[in-house]
Amino acid sequence: MTGIHPVDITSEVKTNFINYAMNVIVDRALPDVRDGLKPVQRRIMYAMLLEGLYSNQKHAKSASVVGEVMKKYHPHGDSSIYDAMVRLAQWWNMRYPMVHPQGNFGSIDGDPPAAMRYTEARMTKVAEELIADLEKETVDLKPNYDETTEEPSVLPAAVPNLLINGATGIAVGMATNIPPHNLTEICNGLLAMIDDPNLTLDGLMEHVTGPDFPTGGRITKTGIREAYATGHSGLKVRGKARIEEKNGRNQIIISEIPYQVNKTNLIQTISAMYKAGKIPDISALRDESDRKDPVRIVVELKRGAIPTLVLNQLYKYTQLQTTYTVINLSIVGGEPRVLPLLNTMQYFLDHRADVVTRRTRYDLRKAEERAHVLEGLLKALDHIDEVISLIRGSNTGAEARDALMVRFGLTEIQSQAILDMRLQRLVGLEREKLQAEFDELQKTIEYLRSILGDEKLLWREIKKEIRAIRDNYGDERRSTITELEEDIGKEDLIAVEDMVITMTKAGYLKRTKLDAYRAQGRGGRGSSGGKLREEDVNTRVFVGSTHDYLLFFTDQGRVFHEKIYDLPEAGRDAKGTHIRNLLPSLREDENIASVLSVGGFDEPGCFIFATRKGVVKKTLITEYGNITSAGLIAINLQPGDELIGVGIVNDIDHVVLATRNGKAMRFESDEVRATGRATQGVIGIRLREGEDDAVVSMALVPGGDEASELLAVSECGLGKRTPVGDYPAKGRGGMGVITLDVTEKTGKLVTLARVAGNEELMVLTEKGTVIRTRVEEVRVTGRNAQGVKVINIAERDSVISAFPIRREDEL
């Protein structure tokens, strides 16, 4: 027989990989739910215990600790052991460090530690609580890797290390990411669980409010309960920053950064975002961190910069805001499990109950053994002369021991203790001391037996120890729990600025900073305002804030909206973007009838609509807050009707409707009852049957100001200005009064608009001619007049559109 056995490679690989995976999961990467330590961390603590590196002793070379661990317990290379030891010492990684470092143990900037031959270490005071009572047989020992010695399978862990320091690890096919917590809160939660075995998660969260990171920061409350209920969730963590003013400029001081964020990387990201134009208002960036302020990053801002806006940009584009993914995975009974918070804490309490029980049994055994010895010593002292005589008469120690056992009924242990007793113990004072010790031991034995016999006393002992841990090591929270913070949206990253919005007859739209218009100053020659085709012209020019909504109402009764900051920004000479590229849901036969800007949909007031057939409708602005990219029905139109204008009114405003045949109807807006969004409206002006008439304009008169003027322009280029007071305010639904004496000379009415007198009048003709004149040059005449020649029209040409726009020097 050769000794070579053929095996199936598939099953062999599967078996070996499973064994490897479980070895990594259980023996390397994941912490035990009881002491919160991975095997390498536990071995480091045990080695430091054996070397006597307590918190009150001298530091020892890190290399000696690493060597001891690698030699006896962890044969996986010195670098992994030293890396684990270094992490246990780093304040920015451990909420309660377990190793007290001396020398260079790295930095929050990601600097590596010095070599282990240069650094020294010892345990911290709180680390001693992990190994307390280890010598009292409180945990099971197991053989080390080569079976030359033993190591603990778990530490007694008087502190809830898994929760106060958290854990991070990547195994095969799984990972753990447990956040650190505040020791005081965890201890209070444990005490509450002992007092109320049926404590709910909400009751527990009255004590444990959330994670507490060593680097501080702000944790959003949303997600914490889910993490505690399921063991898995995401937490939004922000660094802490404040805004200060220095030398007339604002600066942002970052004093705390999110957990596990590298400070140098954060600074580099801020610099990169500035260069990329994401955070343009930074003028200087400095790292002023020192021993007093471990984290102090100064972000100086340019003059005029809005600090809250820059801070939002820092949260959005840098690691100043991160998401911490909670995966509460640990080893339970030799298997990996994701646990809710209550279960994690209960496993710790069960572990402490087991440790305290085993310690009590050990202490009881030792107390009973000592009491047994003292009982023999006291009996010997009561018969000291006889004992001395008996011992002197014996030839050997064994003979003396046997004689004592026979004469006084002692055990072998008691007899040997008498023989080992020094002569000075024979004095009377020593007997009193022995008696006092014996009496005290009897009380101790009684107390220890009561703990083992009464579960309530056991838990009372555990509570006493938890309180002592809390009182000795508890501290204030470093991280702040905040209520829900809105996600940083696009609007939070854009400054509030005034913009000039222009739209041309051909449908090109753009926004330009108002400063670009004002920079020229009054009295200049002006500029084109855009590189337009000869037949194109700006038909709408108005000022709005970047955070305002721009509403586009179509002639088919639909409405679209865009934030002004979403419009293409361009210089004064640029053409802009076509409206159909901005609103792809526009139908081919659908055109923009009106454009309005609003600050939001919670504003007071109503939209008022006018149609070609004389219908008006009024609807609250709040009805339009759910406009989608596909548009929304703004008004239901009758067949053959179309929307010609939309405005914003309050109840004291007046409305003037004008028709092609020169009729105008003025009425108060409160005569139109506000109705729902998808309604048809009511008659505003009645058109005479049989006549080719239609509404061409709607003018709004704020507060019914009769001193303001209405500008009328006809097809043949005649125009006039007429005071609003010349138009009687009649109830809606009538046929109106004459606003223009329409004749063959004037042609039909093209537009009627309210003007202030400082606008420019833009006139477009059928053959593409664009004429621009000042409104103030149009004569003021009566309502029944035909007006005067505003522009000269070529033969066989006519005006198709006329509208006042704000002059550039009035923006």
UniProtKB/Swiss-Prot annotation:
It is found in: Cytoplasm. CDD domains: TOP4c. It catalyses: ATP-dependent breakage, passage and rejoining of double-stranded DNA. GO terms for molecular function: ATP binding; DNA binding; DNA negative supercoiling activity. The active site is at 118 (o-(5'-phospho-dna)-tyrosine intermediate). GO terms for biological process: DNA topological change; DNA-templated DNA replication. Its EC number is 5.6.2.2. Residues 30-493 form the Topo IIA-type catalytic domain. Keywords: ATP-binding, Cytoplasm, DNA-binding, Isomerase, Nucleotide-binding, Topoisomerase. Its main location: cytoplasm. A motif (GyrA-box) lies at residues 520-526. One of its GO terms (cellular component) is chromosome. Gene3D superfamilies: 3.30.1360.40, DNA gyrase/topoisomerase IV, subunit A, C-terminal (2.120.10.90), Topoisomerase II, domain 5 (3.90.199.10), Topoisomerase, domain 3 (1.10.268.10). A type II topoisomerase that negatively supercoils closed circular double-stranded (ds) DNA in an ATP-dependent manner to modulate DNA topology and maintain chromosomes in an underwound state. Negative supercoiling favors strand separation, and DNA replication, transcription, recombination and repair, all of which involve strand separation. Also able to catalyze the interconversion of other topological isomers of dsDNA rings, including catenanes and knotted rings. Type II topoisomerases break and join 2 DNA strands simultaneously in an ATP-dependent manner. Heterotetramer, composed of two GyrA and two GyrB chains. In the heterotetramer, GyrA contains the active site tyrosine that forms a transient covalent intermediate with DNA, while GyrB binds cofactors and catalyzes ATP hydrolysis. Few gyrases are as efficient as E.coli at forming negative supercoils. Not all organisms have 2 type II topoisomerases; in organisms with a single type II topoisomerase this enzyme also has to decatenate newly replicated chromosomes. HAMAP family: GyrA. Belongs to the type II topoisomerase GyrA/ParC subunit family. This is DNA gyrase subunit A. It comes from Deinococcus deserti (strain DSM 17065 / CIP 109153 / LMG 22923 / VCD115). The lineage of its organism: Bacteria, Thermotogati, Deinococcota, Deinococci, Deinococcales. The gene is gyrA.
